Amino acid sequence: MSILPILQIGDVLVSSDIFTEKFCCDLEKCKGVCCVEGDAGAPVTLDEVGEIENALDIVWSDLSASAQSVIDKQGVAYTDQEGDLVTSIVHGKNCVFTCYTSQESTSETDGGLPPGCCICALEKAFRAGKSKWRKPMSCALYPIRVKVFGGGLVGLNYNRWAICKDAVLKGEQLNIPVYKFLKGPLIQRFGEAWYTELCEVAEQFGY
């Protein structure tokens, strides 16, 4: 049975790419470069901006001086050229919450992340038990991007980015489709019942 380009599951329009494409982050190779590259910050909601502001004192010392300066001047988020609310950035690309593991990083010191790896300061605080909020949902769901339509309808699209080529290769080697790689974030965003239905649709089409 051939799969349709777009499927509707509940109030969510799902691109079939999340079933057919493989993906698994390979931080040993990419070092978390997705937090650095790009011409805009990560998409955020107003509620998420509030969560970030609440965590700011906790993560402040992990931020670069340049990032602190940007936040002092314009806050933790801004509206980009497309009209989307996104996290503030430094030098036209780095998210202000970018920080790095040490060159002597170990599983005990940096949660198993490789040395010199970029990590979100918000997630670092969460992993250390200093904050109850992890990071923006748009970051957790990457490489899926969420598009909000009217009437409560949202769309999920697979975003292809050249810097994630190692994640695609690892996903292919391990045979992990995008929707399985992002099981946790998808459940967090849409719920267990919705994800179960998503898996049933995938199985129906042989994925």
Predicted regions and their residues:
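Short loop/turn segments that flank or connect secondary-structure elements
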Residues: 1-207
